[in-house]
Amino acid sequence: MAKKVTGIVKLALNAGKATPAPPVGPALGQHGVNIVMFCKEYNARTADKSGLVIPVEISIYEDRSFTFILKTPPASVLIAKAAGLNKGSGEPNTKKVGSITNKQLESIAETKLPDLNTNNIPQAMKIVGGTAKNMGILIKD
């Protein structure tokens, strides 16, 4: 018989840098999960992706055990990294703060494909392109 899930916690943490301090500690502590064990496992699985924010979905079971699924980094983080920026524009319609090429857009779309609502690259590129536009980043050919 499968274990019964008692809670699902979603967090976005820096890769390889999870610590028992907030937000991890309070989010998992209220479910009675071994926080240090989660931090060690998360850091081990994300060590190769340092510098990125990696969302994680943690399923917590009745016996206080847990499993977690790593998601792809947010499109905005990947776009900002490709454009060499820390953050997007505060006024994306009037102030353009950077640009990325179609090639960079395609590689970001391929990275994000498992977490998007589509299976084809051109549609994924449109989704990621919309995020870039909302960040005030131009897409060049």
Curated annotation (Swiss-Prot):
Q: Which residues cross the membrane?
A: none
PANTHER family in UniProt: 60S RIBOSOMAL PROTEIN L12, LARGE RIBOSOMAL SUBUNIT PROTEIN UL11M
GO biological process annotations for this chain's record? Answer: translation
Q: Does the UniProt entry include the keyword Translocase?
A: no
Function in brief: Forms part of the ribosomal stalk which helps the ribosome interact with GTP-bound translation factors.
InterPro entries from the xrefs? Ribosomal_uL11, Ribosomal_uL11_bac-typ, Ribosomal_uL11_C, Ribosomal_uL11_C_sf, Ribosomal_uL11_CS, Ribosomal_uL11_N, Ribosomal_uL11_N_sf
Q: Is Ribonucleoprotein among the key words of this record? A: yes
Question: Where's it found, cell-wise?
Answer: Plastid, Chloroplast
* An MF annotation (GO) of this entry: structural constituent of ribosome
Q: Which Gene3D superfamilies match?
A: Ribosomal protein L11, C-terminal domain, Ribosomal protein L11/L12, N-terminal domain
Instruction: Fetch the CDD domains from UniProt.
Output: Ribosomal_L11
Source species of the chain: Pyropia yezoensis
Indicate what this protein is called per its UniProt record: Large ribosomal subunit protein uL11c
Q: How is this protein organized at the quaternary level?
A: Part of the ribosomal stalk of the 50S ribosomal subunit. Interacts with L10 and the large rRNA to form the base of the stalk. L10 forms an elongated spine to which L12 dimers bind in a sequential fashion forming a multimeric L10(L12)X complex.
Q: Recite the UniProt keywords alphabetically.
A: Chloroplast, Plastid, Ribonucleoprotein, Ribosomal protein, RNA-binding, rRNA-binding
User: To which protein family does this belong?
Assistant: Belongs to the universal ribosomal protein uL11 family.
Predominant cellular place of this UniProt entry's protein:
plastid
Q: Name one GO cellular component term.
A: chloroplast
